[in-house]
Amino acid sequence: LLRQLDPIQPLTVGVWRGVYERENMTEIERYGFDNSDIVSYHNYGTYLQNIEAIRKLKSYGRPILNTEWLNRCGGNTVEAMFPLFYLEEIGCYNWGLVAGKYQTFEPWNNVWDGYRKNPEAYANFDFTKWFHDLYRPSLNPYDPRETELIQMLCARADANFARTQAQP
């Protein structure tokens, strides 16, 4: 049905449950995935878990976009993940930008509930770090090194893209 509307932009349905093998997807997930021009996915996992997810998703031969990834409390940091996305040529953005009413700098409620039930399961979880947001309410960065890294790698990606577009 969507293709009949002749969309002018690529279509995507997010692969957000962490199921990257088509044969393990539900029928509705497969339908969305099969009709997507771009693979978009969420992964708050570790660096190694993201490498494995990327390996599986690249096998489909489509552009990839990670739409949720930053989880500082769980060890998933800008310093680790943004260079990986840059090197793998994966677009990304994170959930939350400026700390505010939505409180995406806080861990999710289910994390707090899980901690209350089983603190040992969160032994490696650093509750002193912000979960998502990049900027404070003052609009200063949470960590200037993060935003500097993002700006530097985005500038490199833009330059690489410009070079590919300039070639005959």
Predicted feature locations:
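Substrate-binding clefts and catalytic carboxylate motifs of secreted carbohydrate-active enzymes
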Residues: L1-P168
